[in-house]
Amino acid sequence: MSSSGHPRFKPASQPPLQWSEFEKVDMRVGVVVEATDFLEARRPAYKLTIDFGPLGLKRSSAQITHHYRPADLVGRHVVAVVNFPPKQIGPFISEVLVLGAYNEAGEVILLHPDQPVTPGSKIG
């Protein structure tokens, strides 16, 4: 399937953001310290505990089971939005949104820095 045929690849349909709106999004690099199966989730997912350095440990639910195993995620750097309000997902509270790109099959591929950075480093 070509990238234009998948719904995740449609052109932006939202109005442009103002720079001041973008500046409100706090994206940081963290290191996964724990990853377990989220058995209670409706769709296959993992429960992640992520170290964001001075921001501390934060938890997230991530639907990334197609390309990652829990053991492979521990020690991995990820990028997440850290200033959304906590979200209840079944019995779990997700505190951050781990970011990824969708491939043509609609599966999430995690974003990560290509050079070493300190946990808690701000994305800008």
Name each model-derived stretch:
Residues 1-124:
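Phosphate-backbone binding interfaces of nucleic-acid-interacting proteins
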